[in-house]
Regions:
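A structural signal for short hydrophobic beta-strand segments in well-ordered beta-sheet cores
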Residues: 177-180, 237
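A conserved hydrophobic position in a structured secondary element of the catalytic/binding core
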Residues: 10, 91, 138, 180, ...
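Catalytic-core segments of class I nucleotidyltransferases/pyrophosphorylases
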Residues: 24, 136, 143, 149-156, ...
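Conserved N-terminal catalytic core of the sugar/cofactor nucleotidyltransferase
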Residues: 2-5, 15-16, 20-25, 30-57, ...
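Short beta-strand/turn micro-motifs composed of small residues
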Residues: 10, 53, 89, 166-167
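A short, conserved beta-strand element in the Rossmann-like catalytic core
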Residues: 9, 142-145
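Conserved beta-strand termini and adjacent loop/short-helix elements that scaffold enzyme active sites
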Residues: 90, 112-114, 165, 238-241
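A short, conserved acidic/glycine-rich loop-to-beta-strand motif
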Residues: 158-168
Length: 248
């Protein structure tokens, strides 16, 4: 990853402490400052999640194992210490809001309704003023138990605008298959012929985004946005081997 030179103005006493710690670790001042910043960022977890509940995810209120699919999704998010949830809905907003209200298991719920279907990317773009930091996004019709903290670590290690959780399936030809090199997603192949798949990895429907993503959201769907990110080598892949079920 390319580095840039910056200048900082610190109190002399604080700088002495930095130099002392750098000497103890046999680092120069620049290396020590980088380590301090990295440690701080790594300690900051995610607290905001966007859930796609409209369009193709409109089945999120269908019953699965005794309760709406969306309830299972929110159970996972709150279990991962998410305390702010933004639900992007469509014509199903009234049903969702009547069921969940303004909070769920201690997490505040906000609603954003698409008056007309405009695609996932367009819907997400309208939440930009509400989100000013790294955030999680999930498909409201997919059940997973992705370790968000571990995924966030990979996201920060790679330093890209977005990270996509990936899972393996037995029938990859029925999905869009991911081409991956290391942790960098190179592209996608939509429903390849059986036996000709470049991998068994598919999009698991869980994402981590930096706020810079909002400047990319001028397309009709996230698939197009992801294609742009792969062209710029700005999309990371997080391979995930836990529970995964598309309820559509």
């Amino acid at each position: 990853m390319a580095k840039q030179r910056i200048s900082l103005t610190l109190e002399e006493e604080l700088l002495d402490k930095v130099d002392s710690e750098a000497g103890r670790k046999n680092l120069n001042r620049s290396q020590m400052m980088e380590e301090i910043v990295q440690d701080y960022l790594s300690s900051q977890g995610l607290d905001t999640a966007v859930v796609f509940c409209g369009g193709e995810q409109a089945q999120s209120m269908e019953i699965h194992e005794g309760k709406p699919v969306l309830s299972h999704v929110l159970d996972h998010l709150t279990g991962e210490e998410i305390d702010r949830i933004i639900l992007l809905s469509g014509s199903n907003q009234e049903e969702i809001e009547n069921h969940f209200g303004s909070s769920y298991r201690g997490a505040a719920i906000e609603y954003f309704e698409e008056s007309e279907p405009q695609g996932t990317a367009k819907a997400l773009s309208k939440t930009g003023e509400r989100i000013g930091k790294t955030f999680l996004a999930v498909n409201g019709n997919v059940l997973t138990d992705v370790d968000v903290e571990d995924m966030l670590k990979v996201h920060r290690d790679e330093g890209n605008i977005a990270t996509m959780a990936l899972t393996t399936v037995e029938n990859p030809s029925e999905y869009g298959v991911v081409k991956l090199k290391g942790r960098t997603i190179l592209g996608f192949e939509e429903k390849p012929d059986p036996g000709a798949e470049p991998s068994r990895l598919i999009n698991a429907g869980t994402y981590i985004f930096e706020p810079e993503i909002f400047s990319q959201l001028d397309a009709e769907g996230l698939d197009t946005v992801f294609e742009h990110l792969t062209s710029d080598r700005n999309l990371s892949g997080y391979i995930y081997g836990g529970k995964w079920k598309d309820t559509r």
